[in-house]
Amino acid sequence: MQEKDITQKMLERHNDVFSDIVNVLLFDGKKVVEEETLFDAVTDSALKIDGRVRFQDRDVAKYWKDSQINIALFGLENQTTPNKLMPFRVISYDGTEYGKQSRTENIDKKKYPVISLVLYLGFEQKWLYPKNLLGIIDVDEKLKPYVNDYKINLFEIAYLDREIIDSFKSDFWILADYLHQMRVNRNYVADNKSIGHIEELLMLMSAMTGDKRFEEIIDEANTKEVVNMCEVLDIVEARGIEKGIEKGIEKGREEGADIISRLNTILAKEGDLDKIIKANTDKKYRNELLKKYNLLRDYEK
């Protein structure tokens, strides 16, 4: 889980990917947020709870600026499995940023909204938990009019309409396409769309699929200047074949050593040292003995 979380962050921290996600999910694909207007925000913060200092860390956060003025803070939170308490987490993240704006040193500065996007990257099941605060807490009906509700902006990437998925222009399209195909077909067929951030994407694919070959081929992919997932999968497949051959050779060595050991044991019991020496130096004679004692039978199937 932690590995997936880290690799998702690596890809989304790139401004072209981050702005693409925001523009497609919030603005119907219109290029409202430009790459150059995004600036990294601090993602970790400390809270004092029950007398102890506890730390919380957003996945990715960026300020959207006009000149030096903050228009908004966007935060991305990735989830590969549904989390019933996600509204609590989002409130905590957002509240920390609003709390920062309320400090004395910021009193005269322009105030800006905090917008968190929860990206659900699972494809085995839909997100069935409530997406608002009142959906997860028990509230007496007499109190309900006074309890502020808080909803989360949750996007189930694998379940987006195909038209929306195809609106992504960055490497995030490759991830969204993969999730969609796995949900619908339980199989992935690569596309020839160009990859912008090869290392980050391959590490993410390695974490999402559990196939370490994606990560193992990063250097080779960079050397060969791989440009799309079709080429990536060609290398991955070749690496698999190569490993299969290596395993076959190793297995053959082990089986060969086992046969020779069994032959030497038989000859030793016969007490014929000359046979042992000749069997280990004369290949033709050794093969005759192997056939004579039926030692090849188990390995010829």
Predicted ranges, named:
Residues 1-301:
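Elongated, amphipathic alpha-helical interaction scaffolds
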